Swiss-Prot record:
Annotated function: Catalyzes the ATP-dependent phosphorylation of N-acetyl-L-glutamate.
UniProt family annotation: Belongs to the acetylglutamate kinase family. ArgB subfamily.
Keyword set, alphabetical order: Amino-acid biosynthesis, Arginine biosynthesis, ATP-binding, Cytoplasm, Kinase, Nucleotide-binding, Transferase
A single GO cellular-component term on record: cytoplasm
Subcellular location: Cytoplasm
Pathway(s) it belongs to: Amino-acid biosynthesis; L-arginine biosynthesis; N(2)-acetyl-L-ornithine from L-glutamate: step 2/4
GO terms, molecular function: acetylglutamate kinase activity; ATP binding
GO annotation, biological process: arginine biosynthetic process via ornithine; L-arginine biosynthetic process
HAMAP family: ArgB
E.C. number(s) listed in UniProt: 2.7.2.8
Swiss-Prot/TrEMBL site (Transition state stabilizer) positions: 33, 257
Residues the record lists as binding substrate: 68-69, 90, 197
Protein name, as recorded: Acetylglutamate kinase
Amino acid sequence: MTLTVDHAMNIAQVLTESLPYIQRFAGKTVVIKYGGNAMVDDDLKNSFSRDVVLMKLVGINPVVIHGGGPQIGRLLERVGKQSEFIQGMRVTDKETMDIVEMVLSGQVNKEIVNLINRHGGHAVGLTGKDGTLIHAEKLHLTQDRDDPTINIPEIIDMGHVGKVKQINTRIVDLLVQSDFIPVIAPIGVGENGQSYNINADLVAGKLAEALGAEKLILLTNTPGLLDKEGKLLTGLNAEQVQSLIADGTISDGMLPKIQCALEAVHAGVRSAHILDGRVEHAVILELFTDEGIGTLIRNRH
């Protein structure tokens, strides 16, 4: 009996601790980039879906942007097509783009929507092509040439890899106002109707800016931002983050995520959060508890 009472008291403590956060964020929009291990582990997938439904239930407006790199890679391998990566991005020819679009919009997006709906939510799946949500343009990368005597960098054609040119929030606004949960695959459309594969972190950041979101949440496969000793950095302002970039603490795969977060907070998003998607209920723990579990970035304290 004592264990049961203790357990009940713990639940009550969690609920009362969450109350001021629920009140603070009611009516606010939270953009979540969903990816990494959280998308491939069944328990984590269900945990994430329940978190999103709970957010909507208490008056928060979640908007989900998802990736799907591992799923794309598996299908490309099955059809015998090799993937080439440059600066961490997949070179995407026409055939690869067709597969990317098939996987993201036809498989991954529908699975997320189905899980959210199974847990009592009302999710609607979109790509950036729906309602001209994501206007895209071709992304060109540059790299130093092999010949050191040539100072002009080489321009790399990445095929159907794009960047966000403009966000048209109308369809998302309509869905949110109608109590639906938008789930968006990061495929944009160009001026000529071409499809472009866009990094999901970048789409999430730009969408958070365009929606005037309260928060941008990026789920990753790390605990958050770590210092050089491997200790979690829980709260930072933009100036501190820039210093960590300058001294090399933030580098490699984390750098694009952090730059995306910085751009969002500079553009008016109240805060950006780097969370460990491998932790069950990571989103709810960050939003509704005093301690949180990841790294919070604000423009200023």
